[in-house]
């Protein structure tokens, strides 16, 4: 099945603007017959109501309220528009931020947008979820009162959201890596104990493999 290309209208608010916040129930109207689509911009989707499957480049997640899904330009997305009833999409183009920093790849270096990122999903705490939704509301208000060329507050608000998400994502991945190391260390310890106990009578690798399972 082919995917529909979603191209953002830079002139939606009259003057060119490279950032927007839209409700998912509004986005649904533009997903023609199929919910499979490809974006030409960065998208951070916040689920606020309902739950259902949400796929990003063949990785499928069961999305629930307070979940965040990250998408890069060119990635194929598909989500259950019937059961995920609402949320917000924070969408922006790289150049809106990149020229402000010495690092022209600032956006690509965010933990959740890196090529090697382990997951496109992050679940927010109640406190962080509330704080970010308030900031999204501020972004929307700033956009609604937008004057051409006056993007400094918008950039600051977008930067705040990205940094909060980056910190939370790094915390999530460090916890997962810690769990993985703990499991690995437990296996090593168990193996060493088995060898110490049975080394004299058991020399088969299969014996120890069976005991570790």
Where would I find each of the regions flagged by the language model?
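Bimodal feature
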Residues: 59-65, 130-134, 149, 154-157, ...
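Amphipathic, well-ordered alpha-helical segments in soluble domains
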Residues: 43-46, 131-135, 157, 161-164
């Amino acid at each position: 099945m082919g995917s529909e290309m979603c191209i953002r209208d830079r002139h939606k608010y009259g003057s060119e603007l490279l950032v927007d916040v839209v409700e998912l129930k509004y986005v649904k109207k533009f997903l023609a017959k199929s919910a499979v689509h490809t974006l030409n911009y960065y998208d951070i989707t916040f689920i606020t109501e309902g739950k259902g499957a949400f796929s990003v480049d063949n990785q499928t997640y069961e999305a629930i309220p307070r979940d965040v899904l990250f998408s890069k330009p060119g990635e194929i997305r598909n989500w259950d528009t019937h059961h995920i009833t609402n949320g917000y999409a924070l969408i922006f183009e790289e150049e809106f931020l990149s020229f402000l920093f010495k690092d022209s790849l600032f956006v690509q270096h965010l933990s959740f947008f890196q090529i090697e990122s382990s997951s496109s999903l992050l679940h927010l705490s109640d406190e962080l979820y509330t704080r970010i939704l308030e900031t999204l509301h501020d972004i929307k208000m700033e956009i609604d009162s937008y004057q051409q060329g006056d993007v400094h507050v918008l950039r600051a608000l977008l930067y705040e959201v990205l940094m909060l998400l980056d910190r939370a994502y790094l915390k999530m991945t460090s916890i997962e890596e810690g769990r993985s190391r703990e499991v690995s260390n437990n296996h090593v310890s168990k193996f060493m104990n088995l060898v110490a106990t049975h080394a004299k009578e058991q020399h088969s690798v299969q014996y120890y493999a069976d005991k570790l399972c």
